[in-house]
Amino acid sequence: MNRTYSIVWSAVRNMYVVASELARGHSKVKAQVCASEIHSLNKKSEYGQIIKATRAALACAVAAALGFFSPLAMADNQVSYADAQTHVLDASTPPMSYSGTDEGSALYVSGVATVGWQPTTVTGTGLVIETSGGGADDPDGGKYVSNAISLDHYAILELTDAKITTTGIYTQGISAADGSKLTLTDSTLTIDGNFGVMTLYTGSEATLDGTIVEAANSSSAQVQQGSTLNVLDGSTITLAQGQINVVAGNTATDEGSTLNLSDSSVSSAGTMSTIQGTNKAALNLTNATITHTNASGAAVQANNATTLDITGGNITSAGTGVYILASDARIDGATINADGDGIFITSKRKLDGYEDLNALTVSDANVTSKTVALNIDGSTTINDPIKLTNSTFTAPTAIKLGSKATIQAEKTMLTGNIVQTDASSSSLSLSQGSTLTGSVDAMFTTLSLDDTSQWNMTDPSTVGNLTNDGDITLGNASGSTGTLLTVDNTLTLQDNSQINATLDTANSAPIIKAANVTLDGTLNLSSTATFVAPETDEHFGSITLIDSQSAITTDFDSVTLDADTSAMPDYLTINAGVDANDNTNYELSTGLSWYAGANSARAAHGTFTVDAGSTFTVTSELDETTATSNWNGSKLTKQGDGTLILSNTGNDYGDTEIDGGILAAKDAASLGTGDVTIAESATLALSQGTLDNNVTGEGQIVKSGSDELIVTGDNTYSGGTTISGGTLTADHADSLGTGAVANSGVLQVGEGELENTLSGSGSLVKTGTGELTLSGDNTYSGGTTITGGTLRADHAD
């Protein structure tokens, strides 16, 4: 075999190269170099790793050419390609290694400095590449770092089933610069040093396809100066304390760098965020699994005008899930589970010169946190509405508003409280079936719900403005007293609005307070209190439901009450409406069914059913009313064996029907203006006044008290008349009906034929100028007085 050597100066590598060239098929050339230092980027990493180069000694090159190797050179197998050719390696290639304390690489590939730079391409299968070197003092400060692989000047390296290993503190896995490209397929990269998994500079690109990376200590992957890292197809990156850091240069004009992470996983236990993009970086995460097990830092962090796209996948963090600093984030179909904030947005610590991009859209995502699901930091600028679509946010605090923001939730479920910590005018809109379950403490925020959305309030809440066309349930899980919902400015309830509230009899405060109120829709009330029927309408109670600072001029379309009203008699109802005495209050009150309206628990009617042994007194004026039920709005019907007392002489209703028990009135004027019908065994009890109504039926009239009752109607009642005291005056005997008269007072009759049988200890007085004829079999014993006219008796008895 013929072997030739050449010693040449490489401007690319800044050193002399001595190569042994072995003739191979396909014009492939392998070059081995004894130099213990190879070309470096002469750059200092942001994280302190120092990568510099020194020029190899010509004597070492000559010694290598002549076959005289030092023990160190014989132990290492450094491989270098810088010839603008294509080289194919396989598993038969001896392991490549470098252990020198100066800067060096086990494998170095570089393009050639011709017009446009000619790439050198190396492909390999089953290669083993190792480094354990570095650590010597750098004259410029720091320590030299060795690399397993170094790529420079548009080099192309494609490896499959490679095993790349670094050991020792001052080692790094991969360094790529100046447009170089690296592809690792089904390979392993095991990092035991402190100085990095890889560093990509100046427009370089690395692709990990089905590759496993395990890094100890604080080793990280640095992607900077317009470079790109692709992590694809089941690749796994496990970082002990490091991160994937994607960053541009040091100024806002530098080109951004990119991370494309797809169908792969990255995890870290370090205090730094597992994945971080800074200074116009682009983070594209698709169906990725990202795990951060440290309470400090975040699983994903985007800083300074970075664009973040998360599609699918799972993000789990013991700290923050997604941290957004002056950047634009789009999250679609991902699951975020964090012990700290699920999503945190801030403008604080933004570097000068970078646009404050802060924007967020979330769709088809599930965000869960032990603290805050979506946290908007103070002093933060949000440029566009935050859009939440078909997503769930679950945390003790679902949304925290520390700065002005407009949040639009569509088909989204918010479980947790809404808390505002600043005084800016934010807004939260729920639409397209969105739900909020929690309380709201946001005095300066406008909350709105469309007709498909709902708010299940768990505790007393405060908002700036509330517009509701959906369903709101006012809850109080803590059992605190006071108002349930406070609207600092305007409450607007629209046509489809449903307000649901449970009344607490121990809490006298209004359930809603607002500065201005517009009512519409439906109010649904429920109560577990037991109803106790009062004995008079003077004991009716009321509860203020809504307390406004201005007049309430509108009303609900309907009000429902779910309560045990089995003990509530038919003549009583529960009414909801504006307080007649204070139009700034909307109240729930007990009232007469006579005046029931559209927002009463039962329809209006005129029936008073008073059970035996019970008495109910109506002091209110009963007038004709416009009823919406089958009742005519003017007829009073007394039912039951108890007693109904009418005490208002201003009553102006129509007919009276007494079907049972007693209807009593001190003054006959309380009976209204229509006819009176008294059923058999029923009683009309009067004390005074003029009964000018026509009285019919089989029941009786009882005159009580010491005053005078005047009866003037053409009466046909047949149940009899009882005078227990005072005077009963009838201008005509026909006014006394057809039944017997039991008189313990005075009966005065003017004229007519008194066919009734008179009994009792009372007296009979004939008044007026007319003629009165007595035809009954009378037994009264109080005597007879004729003050005028003629008194005739058919029989002396």
Positions of predicted regions on the chain:
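Outer-membrane translocation/initiation segment of Type V secreted surface proteins
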Residues: 5-20, 39-41, 504-509, 529-632
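Extracellular beta-strand/beta-solenoid scaffold signature
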Residues: 76-80, 99-114, 132-152, 167-177, ...
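Extracellular repeat-rich scaffold modules on cell surfaces
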Residues: 376-385, 395, 401-403, 413-454, ...
